[in-house]
Design a protein with these regions (language model features):
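Acidic, glycine-rich A-domain
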Residues: 1-242
């Protein structure tokens, strides 16, 4: 079956048809729907308990003493934490958004993307010749920023691909906004206090006075990004009871 690949010896369903120069979405990428307005009160309570158990166990797994405890819950396959598949998630919105609007009979949608990190640029499929037998195979490689563009085959729009990894995410967002003009894309980035200054200054100049205000408030609204609204929040602000 051409739609089946293998990862670590296990079969994995391919998420896309593999074509040269297309972006590569990792076949191990999945989105999990933990909470929904379709839950009743009992279902929501049960799911919140499950999430608490999972989060507690993931935290305990990093502590050596916890491995000898008998009351640890088993973490399900594919639930272990890894990288940040932010760009893969943005690509998947091309399928999710129209389905969500149709199922819920919506005209306007607020799409909120919460992340605690960035993602690297997505690779592309590229043919190469095997030096051993001269056979041509389809592999993956990083694009060349100085000569690479993203083209949406449906809209015909093209976007220059940047060198910076965060700029690549902005390109994906611009493409989404071009198609889904009735969707408001809101980004929320949880950032450590140590990285707060570097992160917000990445998107443009901020005076020292404005930075001190943002530091005190532990949040800052970034104007120059691919999101319609983009908020940086220092992680310690999440522990406040106010």
């Amino acid at each position: 079956n051409q739609n089946i690949g293998y990862y670590g010896g296990d079969p994995v369903v391919k998420l896309q048809e593999e074509k040269e120069y297309d972006l590569v979405v990792d076949n191990n990428f999945v989105l999990l729907n933990f909470f929904s307005s379709k839950f009743n009160k009992a279902g929501l309570e049960n799911q919140m308990v499950n999430i608490w158990r999972l989060a507690t166990n993931l935290d305990a797994s990093s502590r050596s003493y916890s491995w000898d405890r008998d009351d640890r819950y088993t973490i399900p396959n594919s639930y272990h934490l890894g990288g940040t598949p932010l760009n893969d998630a943005l690509v998947s919105l091309h399928q999710i958004l129209p389905e969500f609007k149709k199922q819920n009979k919506l005209q306007k949608v607020q799409c909120v993307i919460l992340s605690d990190g960035e993602a690297a640029q997505m690779p592309i499929y590229k043919e190469y010749k095997d030096y051993r037998d001269d056979d041509v195979h389809l592999g993956t490689r990083h694009y060349q920023p100085e000569t690479s563009y993203l083209r949406n085959r449906k809209t015909g729009y093209t976007y220059k691909l940047p060198y910076a990894y965060h700029g690549f995410t902005d390109v994906l967002l611009k493409d989404l906004k071009q198609i889904y003009s009735d969707v408001n894309f809101i980004g929320i980035r949880i950032v450590s206090a140590r990285d707060f200054s570097y992160f917000i200054r990445r998107y443009g100049y901020i005076s020292e006075t404005e930075y001190k205000k943002a530091r005190k408030a532990k949040t800052y609204s970034i104007k120059e990004s691919g999101y319609d609204s983009y908020f940086a929040i220092i992680d310690s602000a999440l522990s406040n009871d106010d």
